[in-house]
C-alpha cells in the first residue's frame, strides 16, 4: 500500500474502532440494566410460593449468569486491548447450553446431544488454556 493512503486507512480504522467501542459501551449499559431487572425478578420468584417457582428460579439464575458473562466479556474486551478472548465465548456457550438443558429436558436424546456439546466446549476450553495456545 502506498504511503499516500496510509493516513486515510489509519483514520478509517480508528473511526471504526471508536464506533465499535461506543456500541459495546452502550450494550454494556443495557446489559447492566437488564441484570438489575433480572435481580428484581429473581427476588420476586424467590418469595413466590408456587410449586413451579423453583424451576423459574433456576432458569432465572442461569439467565443472570448469561448477563453477567456478557458484561464480563465486554469488560475484558476493554481491559485486553480491544479484543475478545476466545475462552469467554466458550464460557457463554457452556452456560447457554446448560440453560437449554434446564429449560428443555423432555427428550433424553436431546439432553445427551447437549451434554456432548458441553463436553466438546470443555475440551475446547482445556485446549485454549493449555500452554501451547495461551497468549495472556
UniProtKB/Swiss-Prot annotation:
Keyword Transmembrane: yes
InterPro entries in the record: P_starv_induced_PsiE, P_starv_induced_PsiE-like
Record's signal peptide: none
Pfam family, one: PsiE
Protein name: Protein PsiE homolog
Location in or out of the cell: Cell inner membrane
Transmembrane regions listed in the UniProt entry: 15-35, 58-78, 83-103, 108-128
Keywords assigned: Cell inner membrane, Cell membrane, Membrane, Transmembrane, Transmembrane helix
Natural source organism: Klebsiella pneumoniae (strain 342)
Family that this chain belongs to: Belongs to the PsiE family.
Membrane-topology annotation of the record: Multi-pass membrane protein
Swiss-Prot/TrEMBL GO biological process terms: cellular response to phosphate starvation
Domain of life from the UniProt record: Bacteria
GO cellular component annotations of the record: plasma membrane
NCBIfam families associated with the record: PRK02833.1-2, PRK02833.1-3, PRK02833.1-5
Amino acid at each position: 500500500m502506498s504511503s499516500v493512503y496510509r493516513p486515510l486507512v489509519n483514520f478509517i480504522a480508528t473511526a471504526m474502532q471508536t464506533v465499535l467501542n461506543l456500541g459495546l459501551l452502550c450494550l454494556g449499559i443495557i446489559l447492566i440494566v437488564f441484570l438489575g431487572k433480572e435481580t428484581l425478578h429473581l427476588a420476586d420468584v424467590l418469595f413466590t410460593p408456587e410449586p413451579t417457582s423453583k424451576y423459574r428460579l433456576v432458569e432465572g439464575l442461569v439467565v443472570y449468569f448469561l448477563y453477567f458473562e456478557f458484561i464480563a466479556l465486554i469488560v475484558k474486551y476493554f481491559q485486553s486491548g480491544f479484543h475478545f478472548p476466545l475462552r469467554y465465548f466458550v464460557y457463554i456457550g457452556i452456560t447457554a447450553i446448560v440453560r437449554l438443558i434446564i429449560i428443555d429436558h423432555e427428550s433424553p436424546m436431546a439432553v445427551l446431544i447437549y451434554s456432548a456439546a458441553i463436553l466438546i466446549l470443555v475440551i475446547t476450553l482445556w485446549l485454549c488454556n493449555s500452554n501451547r495456545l495461551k497468549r495472556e
